Swiss-Prot record:
Region of interest (Disordered), ranges: 1-37
InterPro entries in alphabetical order: CALM/Myosin/TropC-like, EF-hand-dom_pair, EF_hand_dom
Modified residues (Phosphothreonine): 88, 127, 129
Record field: compositional bias (Basic and acidic residues): 1-15, 28-37
Gene: MYL3
The name this protein goes by in its record: Myosin light chain 3
Organism for this UniProt entry: Homo sapiens
Phosphoserine sites (modified residues): 179
Amino acid sequence: MAPKKPEPKKDDAKAAPKAAPAPAPPPEPERPKEVEFDASKIKIEFTPEQIEEFKEAFMLFDRTPKCEMKITYGQCGDVLRALGQNPTQAEVLRVLGKPRQEELNTKMMDFETFLPMLQHISKNKDTGTYEDFVEGLRVFDKEGNGTVMGAELRHVLATLGERLTEDEVEKLMAGQEDSNGCINYEAFVKHIMSS
């Protein structure tokens, strides 16, 4: 005679199998840390000749009635760019202490306040190379023939990242499209980087 199988308990039959606990969501990737700007900790490493040159450029932007050697917060990015830097608007706002929109045209700064900002921006450049820009545009090259659609590039420039105005996009793209509305992106990047 075969051994008797134990009969299952009635409670066990009614118990539903326990669901496994939901897996924990994957941890979010750590955001890159912003380089904090503290003007008091910035060591000025420019030569006296460079500082004099920067001062002359700074004075060109001074719109005060008595030439007080001051610019508005809103002009800071323009002066930085005139001095060969290429900060994003977000970087400019960060070194300015993230002022409110209305403060950009009313708050003023003198050259001594500006100089540490220039030093910080020039040391923390994250300038893309020609290859970086070409690689970024290659994503939009659907045919693999070295071109992107002009309309698509216009859309990207106006809606992604540091957005450009319609006028800025038109100036940038003037004379770049071929008869099919395509743009050779390698030539486009060369054009932009030489401007």
